[in-house]
C-alpha cells in the first residue's frame, strides 16, 4: 500500500471503513475511468496515451465483461 499516493490510500481507508461504497466490478470501474482520461482533450497527450495503454492492457488480459 505504501507505493500508492496519499489520495489512493485515503480512498482505500474510506472504502475499508464503509464511508465510501465498494464497487464489486473493480476492473469495469478502472476501465471506465481510464477511458474518460484517454478521451479528455483538456489533459496532456502523454497522460491520455498512458491511460489508453493501461486500458488496452487490461482488455488484453483475462478481464471478461460479464
Curated annotation (Swiss-Prot):
Coiled coil: none annotated. It comes from the Bacteria. Belongs to the UPF0253 family. This is UPF0253 protein Ent638_0728. It comes from Enterobacter sp. (strain 638).
